[in-house]
């Protein structure tokens, strides 16, 4: 009737519009993002997997998945989402004992969950909030996991000298 045609002329529809889908990121943007993470991601995956070749398998699979999914996240969430996907890779969930020539032997000897927490901070460079989100933990639980990963000093406190040594070793490997 006349009411419907008036609504149509005014651009008013009886159904609300769906918001437009976010534009897909360009393949060049995704490639640049992955290139920017490459050194950190390789060290992370090799150390978490306990084996460089299994780490490489995880990186290749995650790059494909990330490239297909990146459009659903704002750019600011890409780092957190990338590390979350990497941690979910089967070859990083079922980890081996570290190889004798592990790049970060002190960290590589940790159990898989604390190893991932330490690597997210020292190698991936994530802050506590992003690292906790990548692991699906609260910030408090993430910080406890880091604390619990450290050996204790003679006073029973987490040994910050070990943390400093791990940080220095990670930095050396990233600068190679």
Predicted regions: what they are:
Residues 2-8:
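Extreme N-terminal basic, low-complexity initiation segments
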Residues 38-46, 56-96, 104, 146:
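Σ70-family region 2.3-2.4 aromatic/basic alpha-helix that recognizes the −10 promoter
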Residues 109-130, 134:
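Short amphipathic alpha helix immediately N-terminal
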Residues 10-43, 53, 67, 72, ...:
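A short, charge-rich alpha-helical start-of-domain segment used by transcription regulators
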Residues 55, 131, 142-143:
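Helix-turn-helix DNA-binding helix
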Residues 101-111, 133, 138, 153:
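Short amphipathic alpha-helical boundary/capping segments
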Residues 135-168:
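DNA-recognition helix of helix-turn-helix
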């Amino acid at each position: 009737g006349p009411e419907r045609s008036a609504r149509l002329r005014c651009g008013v529809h009886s159904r609300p519009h769906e918001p437009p889908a976010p534009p897909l990121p360009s393949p060049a943007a995704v490639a640049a993002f992955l290139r920017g993470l490459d050194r950190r991601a390789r060290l992370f995956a090799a150390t978490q997997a306990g084996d460089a070749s299994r780490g490489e398998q995880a990186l290749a699979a995650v790059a494909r998945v990330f490239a297909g999914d990146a459009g659903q996240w704002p750019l600011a969430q890409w780092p957190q989402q990338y590390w979350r996907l990497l941690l979910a890779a089967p070859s990083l969930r079922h980890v081996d004992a570290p190889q004798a020539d592990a790049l970060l032997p002190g960290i590589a000897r940790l159990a898989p969950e604390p190893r991932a927490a330490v690597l997210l901070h020292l190698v991936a460079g994530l802050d506590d909030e992003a690292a906790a989100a990548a692991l699906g933990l609260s910030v408090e639980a993430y910080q406890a996991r880091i604390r619990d990963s450290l050996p204790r000093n003679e006073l029973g406190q987490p040994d910050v000298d070990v943390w400093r040594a791990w940080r220095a070793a990670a930095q050396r490997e990233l600068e190679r």
